[in-house]
From Swiss-Prot:
Subunit-structure text: Interacts with GDP-bound G-alpha proteins goa-1 and gpa-16. Does not interact with G-alpha proteins when they are in complex with subunits beta and gamma.
InterPro entries according to UniProt: Chaperone_Ric-8_A/B, Gua_nucleotide_exch_fac_Ric8
Job description of the protein: Chaperone that specifically binds and folds some, but not all, nascent G alpha proteins prior to G protein heterotrimer formation, promoting their stability and activity. Also acts as a guanine nucleotide exchange factor (GEF) for G alpha proteins by stimulating exchange of bound GDP for free GTP. Able to facilitate synaptic transmission in the nervous system probably by activating G(q)-alpha (egl-30). Also able to activate the G(s)-alpha in synaptic signaling network.
Family: Belongs to the synembryn family.
This protein's UniProt keywords: Chaperone, Cytoplasm, Developmental protein, Guanine-nucleotide releasing factor
Protein name as it appears in the record: Chaperone ric-8
Keyword Transcription: no
GO molecular function, one term: G-protein alpha-subunit binding
Species this chain originates from: Caenorhabditis elegans
Cellular localization per UniProt: Cytoplasm, Cell cortex
Biological processes annotated in GO: G protein-coupled receptor signaling pathway; protein localization to cell cortex; regulation of establishment of cell polarity; regulation of feeding behavior
Domain of life, source organism: Eukaryota
Protein encoded by which gene: ric-8
UniProt entry tagged with the keyword Cytoplasm: yes
């Protein structure tokens, strides 16, 4: 690291000729190229910002001083003093965002200004205020996002864009997408403006569309597409009503581009994940004719059933791709959780990584739930893939212990994360919103929370509905289903014999009353608060333990209701 920048040194440097200033800061920038913390007083940063602002428009110094600001802006502390309002405005101008004039005399100056703006937008409220205050910044930024595609670049109305070579254009285009991502992540009013601008979809998704139309993409192309998708999510994720940017035409176009990205064989998992997140935003309708194709009616024939099955599943490419990527992500989460269990004290970061991955799969479940709600074909397909007919081997272990997609989803539902709620809703939908079916596949322990939230606990003891359609239980499962513990979803241990075996009726009554007294004492001291199912189907607290026995329903005879009939 070079010497500390203190006030006397700063005054001495800027008191000299431009060549001296350029020489000093070139050396300082090189020495601090990888540094992110600086032993520099805030007063010195204030003075440095003022001095830089005075001379940065000197063509000899612009590039080197922008690089100095970029390096210093890695550290948030003291940055507001370094960035006075005039300096912020000049950085925006050099990034070609605050006016329609060509302020950067060289490509390298423009790129340095972009990098500088990326750091300062992220760390400085002052820079964000100046950025959002100028309506031109958003307009110019959105224009640039759509102007660097090769054919558009060659015919651009802006001279300096036409003169760029492909490598320079790709780099500058990527940096504008980075700026857009940060700007939309931190400015709600900025999000609103773009969400209601019809040009937003074309500007943002052009970079993604280009990648989906190629058989091979560079790392730069992939990174740019990822930034574009993350920006799209930022813009629309907070809106729950209609927005002007997503009309019927743009909705269909967006769904097509996102579908192509998710089903692509050449894009990375990061791009696919970002595309799935974009598909989950509330304002975007599920255009089934685009996402799943049109299901033609069967005209009959010798192989009518086979023809229907093939036609139905041939449109499930998107659904299968989402399920495949979901399973891949859940496998990573479960592996982290299994590794974390014995080492939680020694490696707390592992828990954080598992938690982050869990949060990132929430939108996968949201998309699947919306698709299943809108399409019975998707719902049937997901049921086949996630909860196929049970076999006896699967209930030898608890649901979360099975090495299946169903097992991994059950494992996620045990975590203190919002993802467990959307995962439970997805499973409930493919269970045809059947309380008994959900308990059968997940056990009451995993299902109770979601059913309580929906006020459906009161339906647990209702009789099942008979159906003559295809049974969802295999023959070997039927042979052992009476041995399955409905709470855990697994068969009882072989030695689970009753604790009351061998007792007389008087002994049983005595033990029962002891239990009642013990529970009542715990209730009075506040150790436990037993609950029962209220009239609204939700849990309410009981005043006495005997309320738990009052009006207890008789067990209803079990009938088959687990068909796939819609």
């Amino acid at each position: 690291m070079s010497e500390e920048l203190h006030s006397d040194l700063i005054a001495s440097i800027f008191g000299g000729k431009p060549a001296k200033i350029e020489e000093f800061f070139s050396k300082w920038n090189f020495a601090n190229a990888a540094v992110s913390k600086f032993d520099m007083a805030n007063s010195a940063k204030n003075e440095l910002g003022d001095r830089i602002c005075e001379v940065i428009e000197n063509g000899e110094l612009t590039h080197v001083l922008l690089e100095t600001i970029k390096i210093l802006s890695r550290e948030k502390d003291g940055l507001e003093g370094l960035l006075n309002d005039p300096l912020c405005d000049k950085i925006l101008a050099f990034a070609e965002l605050s006016s329609n004039e060509n302020n950067s005399k060289t490509v390298h100056t423009l790129m340095e200004a972009q990098k500088c703006l990326i750091n300062t937008l992220f760390h400085s409220q002052r820079m964000r205020d100046r950025f959002y205050a100028n309506p031109k910044t958003g307009e110019n930024l959105q224009f640039f996002l759509g102007e660097f595609e090769e054919n558009r670049r060659k015919t651009s109305s802006i001279d300096w864009i036409r003169l760029l070579n492909p490598v320079q254009a790709a780099e500058i285009w990527y940096f504008y997408h980075r700026i857009a991502f940060i700007a939309t992540a931190l400015g709600r009013e900025f999000q609103k403006n773009w969400a209601n601008d019809p040009k937003t979809i074309d500007s943002l998704l052009l970079a993604v569309e280009i990648c989906t139309n190629r058989s091979e993409n560079s790392t730069q192309d992939i990174n740019r597409a990822t930034e574009a998708l993350k920006t799209f999510f930022n813009v629309f994720c907070h809106f729950h009503g209609d927005v002007k940017a997503i009309d019927h035409k743009n909705a269909a176009k967006t769904c097509q581009i996102l579908r192509d990205a998710i089903c692509s064989d050449v894009l990375t998992d990061d791009v696919v994940q970002s595309a799935i997140h974009c598909l989950s935003v509330p304002p975007l309708p599920m255009v089934l004719s685009v996402l799943c194709g049109k299901n033609s009616k069967n005209n009959g024939g010798e192989n009518e059933e086979e023809k229907f099955f093939v036609e139905e599943l041939s449109n499930m490419q998107l659904t299968e791709a989402i399920l495949m990527h979901l399973d891949k992500q859940l496998t990573k989460v479960v592996a982290l959780l299994l590794n974390d269990a014995p080492n939680q004290q020694q490696n707390p970061m592992l828990s954080a990584e598992a938690s982050t991955l869990t949060d990132l799969v929430g939108p996968y479940f949201q998309v699947l739930a919306r698709l299943c709600t809108d399409s019975k074909y998707v719902r049937r397909y997901c049921r086949i893939r996630v909860i196929p007919p049970l076999v006896s081997e699967e209930v030898q272990k608890r649901p979360e212990e099975n090495n299946t997609l169903r097992g991994r989803i059950a494992r996620i539902m045990m975590l203190p994360s919002s993802t467990k709620d959307v995962a439970a809703e997805f499973l409930f939908i493919i269970c045809k919103r059947s309380v008994n079916r959900m308990i059968k596949y997940l056990g009451f322990g995993h299902s109770a929370g979601h059913l309580a939230n929906l006020g459906l606990l009161g339906q647990i003891n209702q009789p099942k509905h008979a159906s003559d359609s295809e049974d969802s239980e295999t023959e070997d499962y039927n042979q052992i289903k009476d041995s399955v513990n409905p709470v855990t979803g697994a068969i009882y241990p072989s030695d689970h014999g009753s604790a009351l075996a061998g007792m007389s009726e008087e002994q049983k009554e005595y033990e029962a009353m002891k239990l009642v007294d013990a529970m009542n004492q715990m209730m009075e001291t506040g150790i436990v608060k037993p609950g029962t199912i209220g009239d609204d189907g939700k849990i309410r607290e009981v005043s006495h333990v005997l309320e738990l026995l009052k009006n207890a329903p008789e067990p209803a005879p079990a009938e088959n209701s687990d068909s796939d009939e819609e």
